[in-house]
Amino acid sequence: MFFNPVLYKKSATDKIFFYETEIVNECADSNVVTAELNKMIVENYAGDCSDVACEKIYIHPEMTDDVIAMIKEHGGEYKKNDEGFALLIGKEIHIWVEDKKGILFAVASLRSMAETGDLTPSFVYDYPRSSVRGYRVFIPGREQFDQFKRIIDMLVYYKYNILMLEIGGAMEYKKHPEINEKWVEYCEYLSEFPNKCAYHRNKFNHVRDSAHPENGKGSFITQEEMKELIRYCEERNIEIIPEVPGLSHCEYIVMAHPEISELKRSSKFGDTYCPSNPKSYELMFDVFDEIIDVFKPKRINIDHDEYNIVGYCEECRKKNPVDIYTEDIIKTYNYLKSKGVEVITEGDKLMDVGGGAGYNEPGDWDYVPPTYPCRDKLPKDMTVINWYAGFGEKSEKPLLECGFELLYGNFRPATFEDWKGRTERGRIEGAMPANWGPFENVYLQRNQQIFDLIYSAYIFWNFEYDDSKKAEVFDKVAEESFRYYNKYFE
């Protein structure tokens, strides 16, 4: 089978098939669980098969002492984990879970075993290595909703639990409709021809790393449409973490309110609000309020990455860049905490990446002052996303030494070095592959999204994976990617 569970004991070579199989769910009713099991039952029906017919599938709401004893009898070690599950597969299939969120993970394992011909009488016990198993994406365009749901179904199949969704200007703001209006105008401008962002950057000598006109497919969806997507995810135990760009990457706000822009030179590309202007926070917090009202999130990613337009207005020029950055994050942190929301931030501006650019030299657009000393002054209950993790363990040591918990962002598992060692030594919650492009199949393939998601899923649920197994796992993931894509995306 594709996954390598913590414990797998095969008791016979007979194949399980489904014929008039009854589902007995002792947990809370779940139409999604029933639908997922019925997919497996219908797709793997074999009434003329001479092997073992599964008569009933039972779903039990707790790991009983008998199940824990069964784990030990089979040579396993029980570990309490809210996402853990046990399977006893035979004439009847029994699913035991610690918490209802584990049910779909158990069902996903059954489906995978059935589809790959590995569903035989056996006992399986499993729980994830990584507590955060996420995927970072843009909001889909209205015409992409079916494809978006197809991707969520894939996350369920490969036992993910997080979707990080960049909001920006791609969701309706009822209090500030001008944000959406200017967002569409901005996206149309950037989409005039390929790589218009780089053209504009060079034309205006503008310090900027990226722009995201793909978000919402260059438009925006209504709050009701967003709630439909949220419901789809929630029903499948996928937690959505809104990614709400703050300070930097704020073009969706700044375009509509150029009076708060730190950059006056180019009204088309002001992407940073002035942290010395109180109106910046009035607008930013209005945006947070609407997003909190729609999503009811446990946590929000405030971004703050690629902060390059630093200290250009008269007020900000008088301040230390480290203080500017620190005060902005703390102000945002305090506001979200007052709303009961935990805070995630990007980590690139918390790192000393070297270089000798100075702040006191008044050259035009030719320096970005360092802000990394602020890491000692920030609240340590924030989670920091390290998307420089591909450069090695040195990228995360200073952040771990400061006391932050980390996530690996822009995760590319096939080339990532020492996953096992680094996640054992540091406070690493997990990782997230990222999609910075559209949802169409051709882009998913070109950008290796299917491959990265499946490879990541394999190591999120595998305690034995290390660098020595890369070649073996690469081949296994390539085969599985081909199988899944052709079954569910074509």
What is the meaning of each model-derived region?
Residues 1-11, 27-34, 50, 115, ...:
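Substrate-binding groove of N-acetylhexosamine-processing glycoside hydrolases
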Residues 16-26, 54-57, 93, 133, ...:
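Hydrophobic beta-strand segments of well-ordered beta-sheets in folded domains
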Residues 26, 43, 55, 144-147, ...:
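Residue-identity detector for glutamine
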Residues 61, 167, 435:
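Short secondary-structure boundary segments
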Residues 69, 253, 312, 355-356, ...:
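Short, well-ordered secondary-structure micro-motifs
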Residues 1-101, 105, 109-125, 345-352, ...:
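Acidic, contiguous N-terminal accessory segments
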Residues 80-316, 321-331, 337-339:
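Feature activates predominantly on carbohydrate-active enzymes
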Residues 66-68, 142-146, 394:
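Short, solvent-exposed loop/turn elements at domain surfaces
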